[in-house]
């Protein structure tokens, strides 16, 4: 039967080998609360081992999108897993949750044990950065749906917060200040536009080093998404963070207003933080308006916190003590949506 299945495009033995290779990466993500080991039908986690009095589970799921196409082109697969974890754990973090465990779903055109191990290595790296245990997942070989070199990855994160410490944004008021945490670059959003502007229309080469970068363009674009969990949780535990936003698809314009109560808006001081060079590089090559850039990309700020004015210095000090670079990027005002002060948008 296995020979017939292999002739149909599914290599069971390669799948077994991939599982063997990923075990050591899974094991280094273990944490308090994990029950059982890799290979069960379901991942188990004992919440009673953690010191929560009224725990509320907060979950999130996401993928990496068409950033994967660049990984295929570069044949570089060891950081895409970090992106998959980051997109999920940063979302649950925005509600004040401590990520507990993570599951991944990997669909491949052909089971290549070495490539699968590289992908899962990245997932485990992301789990370590976020304090999450990788307690399960699925790797599906799907010939005919994906080409031999293609795959897709998605993840699912579950976190926990004390019921009376969940960060919902409901306590944000006019006058709250906005703290921005720097991104590592594009993160995992807007890559359909990136590929069109730089590769399809621009004809640029992923293996070439362009000014102002110090490495090939493909490596610049594949820089993994930052994971903000550990420093931000330190700030959240102070009780002085009233709202948070993960700046993902939709950029500033869609994501920052998501944390605000009705009747309030965000005024952003454009120019109050350094914008990484990948963004003006992309804007110049695509002749994109700045408003569109802020509506698609993170523009150098991957996570935003809302705090009272009197708490600003303390929260920034806490974040920077954890190695974060934090900027005062704006404030909350009456109104709807988002506006930009400082340097005008073009």
Curated annotation (Swiss-Prot):
BP GO terms, sorted: 'de novo' IMP biosynthetic process; adenine biosynthetic process
Pfam families membership: AIRS, AIRS_C
PANTHER family reported for this sequence: TRIFUNCTIONAL PURINE BIOSYNTHETIC PROTEIN ADENOSINE-3, TRIFUNCTIONAL PURINE BIOSYNTHETIC PROTEIN ADENOSINE-3-RELATED
Record's catalysed reaction(s): 2-formamido-N(1)-(5-O-phospho-beta-D-ribosyl)acetamidine + ATP = 5-amino-1-(5-phospho-beta-D-ribosyl)imidazole + ADP + phosphate + H(+)
EC number, UniProt record: 6.3.3.1
GO cellular component entries: cytosol
Associated pathway: Purine metabolism; IMP biosynthesis via de novo pathway; 5-amino-1-(5-phospho-D-ribosyl)imidazole from N(2)-formyl-N(1)-(5-phospho-D-ribosyl)glycinamide: step 2/2
Source organism of this protein record: Bacillus velezensis (strain DSM 23117 / BGSC 10A6 / LMG 26770 / FZB42)
Family statement drawn from the similarity comment of this UniProt entry: Belongs to the AIR synthase family.
UniProt key word Metal-binding: no
The protein's name in its UniProt record: Phosphoribosylformylglycinamidine cyclo-ligase
């Amino acid at each position: 039967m296995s020979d017939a299945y292999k002739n149909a495009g599914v290599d069971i033995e390669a799948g077994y080998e991939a599982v063997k290779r990923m075990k050591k990466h899974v094991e280094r993500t273990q944490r308090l609360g994990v029950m059982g080991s890799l290979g069960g039908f379901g991942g188990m986690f004992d919440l009673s081992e953690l010191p929560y009095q009224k725990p509320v589970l907060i979950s999130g799921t996401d993928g990496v999108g068409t950033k994967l196409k660049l990984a295929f082109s570069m044949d570089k697969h060891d950081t895409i897993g970090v992106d998959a974890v980051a997109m999920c754990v940063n979302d649950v973090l925005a509600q004040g949750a401590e990520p507990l465990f993570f599951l991944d779903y990997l669909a491949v055109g052909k089971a290549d044990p070495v490539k699968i191990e590289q992908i899962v290595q990245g997932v485990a790296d992301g789990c370590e950065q976020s304090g999450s245990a990788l307690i399960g997942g699925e790797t599906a070989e799907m010939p005919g749906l994906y080409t031999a070199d293609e795959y897709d990855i998605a993840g699912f994160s579950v976190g926990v917060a004390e019921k009376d410490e969940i960060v919902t944004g409901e306590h944000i008021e006019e006058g709250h200040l906005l703290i921005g945490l720097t991104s590592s670059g594009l993160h995992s959003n807007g890559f359909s536009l990136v590929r069109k502007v730089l590769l399809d229309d621009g004809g640029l080469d992923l293996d070439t080093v362009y000014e102002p970068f110090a490495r090939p363009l493909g490596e610049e674009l594949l820089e993994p998404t930052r994971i903000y969990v550990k420093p931000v949780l330190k700030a959240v535990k102070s009780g002085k963070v009233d709202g948070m936003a993960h700046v993902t698809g939709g950029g500033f314009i869609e994501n920052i207003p998501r944390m605000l109560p009705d009747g309030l808006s965000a005024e952003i001081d454009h120019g109050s933080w350094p914008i990484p060079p990948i963004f003006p590089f992309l804007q110049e090559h695509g002749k994109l308006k700045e408003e569109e850039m802020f509506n698609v990309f993170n523009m150098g700020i991957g996570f935003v916190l809302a705090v009272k004015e009197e708490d600003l210095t303390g929260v920034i000090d806490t974040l920077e003590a954890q190695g974060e670079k934090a900027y005062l990027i704006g404030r909350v005002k009456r109104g709807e949506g988002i506006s930009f002060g400082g340097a005008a948008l073009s």
